[in-house]
Design a protein with these regions (language model features):
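Serine-esterase "nucleophile elbow" of acetyl-processing enzymes
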Residues: 1-61, 71-80
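Structural recognition of the beta-strand scaffold that forms the well-ordered cores
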Residues: 16-18, 54-59, 83-87, 122-126, ...
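Catalytic-core regions of hydrolytic enzymes
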Residues: 60-83, 97-107
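Active-site segments of SGNH/GDSL-like serine hydrolases
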Residues: 87-91, 112-143
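Catalytic His-Asp segment of secreted/periplasmic serine-dependent ester chemistry enzymes
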Residues: 128-215
Length: 215
């Protein structure tokens, strides 16, 4: 994570990309409120006065790791990013699709390599847990897919933001952070943003974008 933190010490503008599925896309389930990428943008470009930084979301609802690979050149490479935040897995762990666990892990490794080949830093993220007992096509497989994210990040010595573990550590709030079985609401996106701030050492309790009430 130190490689990412150093960007905040530089006067050079930084290009940040957030890549993933509907959870990062932030559509529908926030009901018009800011998603975690928009909150990150507020914190970085306004509150930290990094006005020349560019923050791009190229996440697409319904996507999976195979889709991220297939459209990588258009959605990531053309922008020549400095940092790529990757959050994926909720659709991969769906038993109704044809992405097996081994392919998921392989896709993660290939994504990490492709991001690294651009000279960018990949930041792996686990995603929000599924509400207990819901989404039976996903729930039994979710933990193993999150473990794959942790393993690839560890094997490649990549930064990891472990939202899944953080949410499990705050299990009493889990229900209040969700819009349905596996999509976070606006409060869930605030929880995402706050953990990112803390992991990057840019959390400030006096900041407007850091001090939102989260149930």
């Amino acid at each position: 994570m130190e490689r990412v933190k150093k960007f905040f010490e530089s006067d050079a503008p930084v290009k940040w990309i957030f890549y993933g599925d509907s959870i990062t896309h932030g559509a529908l389930h926030t009901f018009g409120q800011r998603d975690y990428v928009e909150l990150f943008s507020e914190r970085v470009r306004f509150e930290l006065a990094r006005t020349m930084d560019i923050i791009i979301t190229t996440a697409i609802s319904g996507d999976n790791s195979r889709g991220l690979l297939n459209s990588f050149d258009w959605r990531v490479a053309q922008f020549k990013p400095d940092v790529v935040f990757l959050m994926i897995g909720m659709n991969d762990c769906n038993a109704d699709n044809d992405i097996e666990f081994d392919e998921f892990e392989s896709n993660l490794s290939e994504l990490a390599a492709k991001i690294g080949d651009l000279g960018a830093v990949p930041v792996f993220q686990t995603t929000c847990p599924i509400l207990p007992g819901q989404a039976p096509e996903r729930f039994p497989h979710f933990d193993s897919y999150m473990d794959a994210i942790r393993k690839v990040a560890s094997d490649r010595k990549l930064p990891l933001i472990d939202h899944a573990q953080y949410w499990k550590d705050h299990a009493d709030s889990h229900f209040y952070w969700m819009n349905n079985a596996f999509h976070p609401n606006a409060d869930g996106h605030r929880a995402f943003a706050q953990l990112i701030y803390r992991c990057l050492d840019i959390y400030d309790e006096n900041s407007h974008s850091c001090r939102f009430h989260i149930p």
